[in-house]
Amino acid sequence: MFQDNPLLAQLKQQLHSQTPRAEGVVKATEKGFGFLEVDAQKSYFIPPPQMKKVMHGDRIIAVIHSEKERESAEPEELVEPFLTRFVGKVQGKNDRLAIVPDHPLLKDAIPCRAARGLNHEFKEGDWAVAEMRRHPLKGDRSFYAELTQYITFGDDHFVPWWVTLARHNLEKEAPDGVATEMLDEGLVREDLTALDFVTIDSASTEDMDDALFAKALPDGKLQLIVAIADPTAWIAEGSKLDKAAKIRAFTNYLPGFNIPMLPRELSDDLCSLRANEVRPVLACRMTFSTDGTIEDNIEFFAATIESKAKLVYDQVSDWLENTGDWQPESEAIAEQVRLLAQICQRRGEWRHNHALVFKDRPDYRFILGEKGEVLDIVAEPRRIANRIVEEAMIAANICAARVLRDKLGFGIYNVHMGFDPANADALAALLKTHGLHVDAEEVLTLDGFCKLRRELDAQPTGFLDSRIRRFQSFAEISTEPGPHFGLGLEAYATWTSPIRKYGDMINHRLLKAVIKGETATRPQDEITVQMAERRRLNRMAERDVGDWLYARFLKDKAGTDTRFAAEIVDISRGGMRVRLVDNGAIAFIPAPFLHAVRDELVCSQENGTVQIKGETAYKVTDVIDVTIAEVRMETRSIIARPVA
């Protein structure tokens, strides 16, 4: 009798529209209950029975109930699930399988089965890729997943690599395909095989993509030819190899090994500028005046060269610093190293005065055994030989940026606009409280940004620099020329790593069009989106593998008195994040480890400080001694404790 009653339907509709609702993201806790976080200020309690309908990270709409002054949320509608495709560890066997997602806040096993056509018999401990198929808020009785890919078995030593690559849906190996002969590009190549070109790289590098030749000119000026490997001499635009490189966008460098953008025959052999092998190159000839300015007579041209020596960073640095027993194999090579060091000195001074120079941070290198075990992690400081190559590459990229801008008006540019204009006033106010006065308008210009950076670099500590980092915008890849505030340059376009960056291959093709006097097509904006996304995924993969290896490396230090110097990198309500100075590992120090009485402790992300009883006890950039309290292998997290 009530079935089609319009009054009843109207009443239901009314009740529904009058019931308060909220949209937000579910945050799970270890204790079974959770919270619906609507924004930074507002959250609602979700009781344990209701949490069974949702998963940490789900975006949902919930009905808000009020009982005795207490509000709680009842999940009603799924807006966006947190899990769609994920990696995890399989439990059970054959017909009764479940998968536990590999995520610090997802502990529950999700029932699952293998997808049709997946020929693997899953067993306990296997790693797999899964996709969610059912969700209680979609009208299903429970969560349910389908296993779509077998990754590896549980005890595989290389789990960190295979699981991470599967998680980010990245390739595991080099692309297939081989280039058998060079293309006829209609380019006249200068024969520079008689010149003493050298490469400077790590001892283990196989994909050498830059060689250098320097010459002193009579008037005190210096000339540099930067010769870059020429993969576009082998790979035609739109070919199968080109399409594969376009998707990968970059070589993916992970601790212990890399997954190249191009087939290894090209990256490590045909294109690699090996010593005593004749190779085609794209080259740039530039002249530096006595103060390091790049003169206007920049020349791009195609050539063939033969590198006369594969030099190694540390050996070159030792020789220039008069230490070690390595010697250049001939006076001609020694003269090249001396001239390149002069160019580096000049360009370094020019950039210091007219642009910006990054502070030197060490690179951390994992030394791995046969089974992927971490034998050691070494900090490799950036020395004079690293700076020689860096200055040569930056100069070459400035040249490409100018030529592409002036001749074509487009290219693949690295653009960084400094501070977000919306943050300019807040930035000026923050700096003022620390005694630095800047004009909110001026700081948005390249000159104003550089002026501020130089003032910050002159500060006794990096504390203020760390405070303003959050006001900066991100670097972007653009087809339009634009400034790079971070480098302090009017324009910057890379072309010096075409073996490992697809954007550099595009710039090679554009520069070749300029050399031949031909018209060129502007690259499509979609390619910059793909490159930015791939760069993000590759960085996340490198970080994930690193976290896993750091946890393995430090596991036996947990609970011991071994001390580590650690720099505070971030402070949040829950505690501090620190970076171990000797090996680069990130560890977390929970607030209770800083001071036992919670009411006397204030951890402020806003101020970058920890106060105890009103006194500043710690601040970002401080270096403190810590011990390792615990290493949680299942979440690859390292918990540290300050040394009292």
UniProtKB/Swiss-Prot annotation:
Primary role: Involved in mRNA degradation. Hydrolyzes single-stranded polyribonucleotides processively in the 3' to 5' direction.
SUPFAM superfamilies per UniProt: Nucleic acid-binding proteins
GO MF annotation: an example: exoribonuclease II activity
Domain RNB per the UniProt entry, residue ranges: 189-516
The reaction(s) this protein catalyses: Exonucleolytic cleavage in the 3'- to 5'-direction to yield nucleoside 5'-phosphates
PROSITE patterns linked: RIBONUCLEASE_II
NCBIfam families reported for this sequence: 3_prime_RNase, PRK05054.1, RNase_B
Enzyme type, top EC level: hydrolase
Location(s) in or outside the cell: Cytoplasm
Primary localization class, coarse: cytoplasm
Statement: the UniProt record of this protein carries the keyword RNA-binding: yes
Gene Ontology annotations of biological process type: mRNA catabolic process
Domain of life: Bacteria
RNA-binding is among the record's keywords: yes
Family: Belongs to the RNR ribonuclease family. RNase II subfamily.
EC number of the protein: 3.1.13.1
Protein name (database record): Exoribonuclease 2
Domain S1 motif positions: 561-643
InterPro entries linked to this entry: CSD (IPR011129), NA-bd_OB-fold (IPR012340), RNase_B_OB_dom (IPR013223), RNase_II (IPR011804), RNase_II/R (IPR001900), RNase_II/R_CS (IPR022966), RNase_II/RNase_R (IPR004476), RNR_Ribonuclease (IPR050180)
One Gene Ontology CC term in the entry: cytosol
UniProt keyword annotations, A-Z: Cytoplasm, Exonuclease, Hydrolase, Nuclease, RNA-binding
